């Protein structure tokens, strides 16, 4: 909608704190008031801080027209995929399919698919300890082939 409207209307819409807040609320799974305030404050501080309307619209178009799965065959290092069980931007089935695309290429021993339960897209806010623990375990493995 921000792209379809004239710039005088579309630009403020893209920077809208109301839209940022609604999006933030829809993506959160936590019920902890302090965490909800923190996430909302982070989104309010950073979501409207893009350089140009054109740039944010280009980024959006790229985000809906390509996926990381397209680049899987080119990845030549072990991969750990952290997936939110209840992510609004992707399903566990889609994530498993993306991970399966990685398994047939060289350097796949030791790779991990990790599902973090009861969390949405905001793993880094809502379950940072669980995510960091999984990453720490993964990075300390011996990946000698």
Language-model features: locations:
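Conserved alpha/beta-hydrolase "acid-adjacent" motif
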Residues: 35, 88-94
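Residue-level signal for the nucleotide or nucleotide-sugar donor/cofactor binding architecture
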Residues: 51, 90, 126
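Short, conserved loop/helix-junction motifs that constitute active-site signature segments
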Residues: 72-76, 101-108
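Catalytic active-site module of serine/aspartate enzymes centered on a nucleophile-bearing elbow/loop
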Residues: 103-145
């Amino acid at each position: 909608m921000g792209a379809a409207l004239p710039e005088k209307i579309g630009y403020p819409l893209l920077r809208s704190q109301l839209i940022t807040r609604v999006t933030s609320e829809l993506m959160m799974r936590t019920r902890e008031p302090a965490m909800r305030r923190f996430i909302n404050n982070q989104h309010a501080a950073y979501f409207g801080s893009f350089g140009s309307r054109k740039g944010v619209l280009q980024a959006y178009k790229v985000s809906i027209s390509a996926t990381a799965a397209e680049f899987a065959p080119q990845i030549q290092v072990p991969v750990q995929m952290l997936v939110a069980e209840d992510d609004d931007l992707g399903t566990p089935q889609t994530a498993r399919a993306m991970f399966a695309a990685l398994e047939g290429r060289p350097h796949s021993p030791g790779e991990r698919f990790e599902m973090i339960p009861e969390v949405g897209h905001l793993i880094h806010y809502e379950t940072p300890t669980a995510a960091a623990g999984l990453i720490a375990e993964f990075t300390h493995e011996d990946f000698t082939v």
